[in-house]
From Swiss-Prot:
Naturally occurring in which organism (per UniProt): Lactobacillus delbrueckii subsp. bulgaricus
Protein name (record): ATP-dependent 6-phosphofructokinase
Compartments reported by the entry: Cytoplasm
Active site: D127
Chain residues that bind Mg(2+): D103
Matching PANTHER family: ATP-DEPENDENT 6-PHOSPHOFRUCTOKINASE, PHOSPHOFRUCTOKINASE
Length: 319
């Protein structure tokens, strides 16, 4: 193996650039040539491929987003798209690929490996919904961003004795909602993975108001319903002065935290070393503080396990 490619795919996440930096520098330090692939699998098929040197990534560790750009390209699930991508890899003499992204990106990495081009998947998504890793690249930063925003919302909520329903990202995973809800002192946290009772939440908010609390906060994961929809449901059980707020795409931005920078660096380095060992079709993650790797196929048969004890903790803290 002499030459590797790097691409970022799907939704962007803080720390992706730090991962690109790590892959590039470790690969070059081990005598490999590195090529960046712009716009994910769409750019691979289009041949948007260029050489990377250490100086090209020197400024990236603290920069959010992805300087390789990203795009969703469902056509890569089809044989025709895969063969077009393989043709571009052959044309540029690329022997292996590091793919940074979510579960859809892992499917692409697996297909490249099946076609004879070893590929390693790195978990780059704020959703933290990838099995066999305790954290994904971007998750910690997204939580910090959401916490900072909700802290500000609490300021205005207290000034007007209002209840705020706040939507956070995460698709069908409630990890951001749980972690941020506990950190922000939410009265309730609502996630897709666990049942909830709007009437019970309404009663809890009433009790808090009666005890003298000057604000209310419900954190709702986007996979449950919109903040407006939840607000409408809540109003059926009480005459609340309530507002809905959607944090949205701000959670994908912001300077990566220390945790995300270090995680991205560790996983990027491990990806290169796995490729140097001739391995492919693997997903790299962090488990109990140690860098691990699993067959990508295993991820498709497993589901992410959230820290649902946080819900009980929050229920105890909000009484």
């Amino acid at each position: 193996m002499k030459r590797i490619g790097i691409l970022t795919s799907g939704g962007d996440a803080p720390g992706m650039n730090a991962a690109v930096r790590a892959v590039t520098r470790v690969a070059i330090a081990n005598g490999l040539e590195v090529f960046g692939i712009r716009y994910g699998f769409a750019g691979l098929v289009a041949g948007d491929i260029f050489p990377l040197e250490s100086e090209d990534v020197a400024h990236l560790i603290n920069v959010s987003g992805t300087f390789l750009y990203s795009a969703r390209y469902p056509e890569f699930a089809e044989e025709e798209g895969q063969l077009a991508g393989i043709e571009q890899l052959k044309k540029h003499g690329i022997d292996a690929v590091v793919v940074i992204g979510g579960d859809g990106s892992y499917h692409g990495a697996l297909q490249l490996t099946r076609h004879g081009f070893n590929s390693i998947g790195l978990p780059g998504t704020i959703d933290n919904d990838i099995p066999y890793t305790d954290a994904t690249i971007g998750y910690d930063t997204a939580c910090m961003t959401a916490m900072d925003a909700i802290d500000k919302i609490r300021d205005t909520a207290s000034s007007h004795h209002r209840v705020f329903i706040v939507n956070v990202m995460g698709r069908n995973c409630g990890d951001i909602a749980m972690r941020v809800g506990v950190a922000c002192g939410a009265d309730a946290i609502v996630i897709p993975e666990r049942p909830y009772d709007v009437e019970e939440i309404a009663n809890r908010l009433k009790q808090a108001q009666e005890s003298g609390k000057d604000h209310g906060l419900v954190v709702v994961a986007e996979g449950v319903m919109t903040a407006d929809q939840f607000m409408a449901e809540l109003k059926k059980y009480g005459d609340f002065d309530v507002r809905a707020n959607v944090l949205g795409h701000m959670q994908r931005g912001g300077t990566p935290t220390v945790s995300d920078r270090v995680l991205a660096s560790k996983l990027g380095s491990e990806a290169v070393h796995l490729l140097l060992e001739g391995k492919g079709g693997l997903a790299v993650g962090i488990e109990n503080g140690k860098v691990t790797s699993h067959d990508i196929l295993d991820l498709f048969d497993e589901s992410h396990r959230g820290d649902y004890d946080l819900l009980k903790l929050n229920a105890d803290l909000s009484r």
